[in-house]
Amino acid sequence: MNKHASQPRAIYYVVALQIWEYFSFYGMRALLILYLTNQLKYNDTHAYELFSAYCSLVYVTPILGGFLADKVLGNRMAVMLGALLMAIGHVVLGASEIHPSFLYLSLAIIVCGYGLFKSNVSCLLGELYEPTDPRRDGGFSLMYAAGNVGSIIAPIACGYAQEEYSWAMGFGLAAVGMIAGLVIFLCGNRHFTHTRGVNKKVLRATNFLLPNWGWLLVLLVATPALITILFWKEWSVYALIVATIIGLGVLAKIYRKAENQKQRKELGLIVTLTFFSMLFWAFAQQGGSSISLYIDRFVNRDMFGYTVPTAMFQSINAFAVMLCGVFLAWVVKESVAGNRTVRIWGKFALGLGLMSAGFCILTLSARWSAMYGHSSLPLMVLGLAVMGFAELFIDPVAMSQITRIEIPGVTGVLTGIYMLLSGAIANYLAGVIADQTSQASFDASGAINYSINAYIEVFDQITWGALACVGLVLMIWLYQALKFRNRALALES
């Protein structure tokens, strides 16, 4: 590997794949809740349940995907297989109007593909560098920024394709994006020869009457089938319960593994941060469900004579994250003075405060809709942008703290537990919250009248709920600040 190159050539193929994966995933996600309600005519409750189940399980399957990559497939093969499964899933989703079983099957295939892809693409990128290579951080930053580009473009492109042509075309465009990324990645295959490939020895070994490659095929067929049943029977909550129990058990084992009080305090800090992060994301994930339907039903989307497709609003959040992230990275320089724990809680308070402010703006928007029939587009854009800005003070802070823990060999496991709680469980809670907006009545002609008051009430409750979290976090911040101050005074005396 050339140490003098700005970045290894292989990274550009990984980045291209990451852009198209974000394009594929977020393009489809922007359409899903609208497809369920507007095209398949699911009631809001059923749509929210399926949407939250899907968004929850995509954070559970990466655990299995990471295990398969570590033991058998290697990161490169796992990523390619995951990308292929996601493309197939999007194609099948386009045919779901034929029969509901195609809907459940397509979502299950996408969940499995996401599990193989998401947990291993970062590991594949890490394989391109030596442990001490100074280019490593720059490579990960490049991949993160590229992903945001994909998530900005996807809702615009897929939303336009759906609005101007058909739902199948919107989902098909997401599939084309994933296939394009996979083709580009395969074109750079020669640059990945030094990365870990398939473990052929393990694959050929025999266990329980079958070679491991046979069991792998069984797993690749059985897992989508099982997840399809979970979606169909609405049993996904049981899978989350099992995963959470296992995660908490592992967390207890890590706590016992801690060798001193400092390590236990670090773990306690991570657990507390994870709890508040879970609540934050339960609020933030309204963007793909209740907020999306609110925009579709109650926001005036006309701009210069063009009606902006609802799905396009999903780009605002990603654009705010990227724009504000660049601003914070280039302009704001964090001081090393003071106590790091105090700074962490200060950032969490700011993130939750911005989330509360964002929903306060949405509450005003909903009240405007109640008074005048429709809310204004700029007010909606402002609320979503503030919520996107809030994200920068939650996940990066928590993940940074996890990587600092001094208990050896637990960083990956803690990251998985964090994703389980702040991703899977938070998305389930988001579905429960969103369902509170599903109040509707029928007029004499049988048309559905959706209740704007339900949206006002839910947005208002989230505003105050996030503000209550800010109060709790500020109490912790004040306690830590006073403790640090008293310790400093004691040392001076």
UniProtKB/Swiss-Prot annotation:
Organism domain of life: Bacteria
BP GO annotations: dipeptide transmembrane transport; protein transport
InterPro entries linked: AA/pep_transptr_DtpD (IPR023777), Dipep/tripep_permease (IPR005279), MFS_dom (IPR020846), MFS_trans_sf (IPR036259), MFS_Transporters (IPR050171), POT_fam (IPR000109), PTR2_symporter_CS (IPR018456)
Keyword rRNA-binding: no
Location in the cell: Cell inner membrane
Main location: membrane
Swiss-Prot/TrEMBL keywords: Cell inner membrane, Cell membrane, Membrane, Peptide transport, Protein transport, Transmembrane, Transmembrane helix, Transport
Hydrolase as UniProt keyword: no
Record's bilayer topology term: Multi-pass membrane protein
Residues on Cytoplasmic side: 1-13, 70-77, 122-137, 188-211, 256-266, 333-343, 400-412, 483-493
A Pfam match: PTR2
Name listed for the protein in its UniProt record: Dipeptide permease D
Organism: Escherichia coli (strain K12)
Organismal lineage: Bacteria, Pseudomonadati, Pseudomonadota, Gammaproteobacteria, Enterobacterales
